[in-house]
Swiss-Prot record:
Pfam families: Ribosomal_S19 (PF00203). One of its GO terms (molecular function) is structural constituent of ribosome. Keywords: Ribonucleoprotein, Ribosomal protein, RNA-binding, rRNA-binding. It comes from Prochlorococcus marinus (strain MIT 9215). Belongs to the universal ribosomal protein uS19 family. GO terms for biological process: ribosomal small subunit assembly; translation. SUPFAM superfamilies: Ribosomal protein S19. It comes from the Bacteria. NCBIfam families: rpsS_bact (TIGR01050). HAMAP family: Ribosomal_uS19. The keyword Repeat does not apply. GO terms for cellular component: cytoplasm; small ribosomal subunit. This is Small ribosomal subunit protein uS19. Protein S19 forms a complex with S13 that binds strongly to the 16S ribosomal RNA.
Amino acid sequence: MGRSLKKGPFIADSLLKKVEKQNTDNDKSVIKTWSRSSTILPVMIGHTIAVHNGKTHIPVFITEQMIGHKLGEFAPTRTYRGHIRDKKGAKS
């Protein structure tokens, strides 16, 4: 279930301030954030935001198709390396 339209989209205040400051300064440097739950707004298009995945910051370039999604959707937190293979010639 989505968020109520009456409330509007959630975005961290500090992140929104950084994006708006870069828009006024015409600066496109990487913005680091831990706010995975922030919604991507049209103001963010063209920016690169480094989203924390629990270990490192993953750079995410914002495009038009990402509007309305959350930042955390583009920075996976789990790594899957496949199931362990059986050793060759192992007896069961």
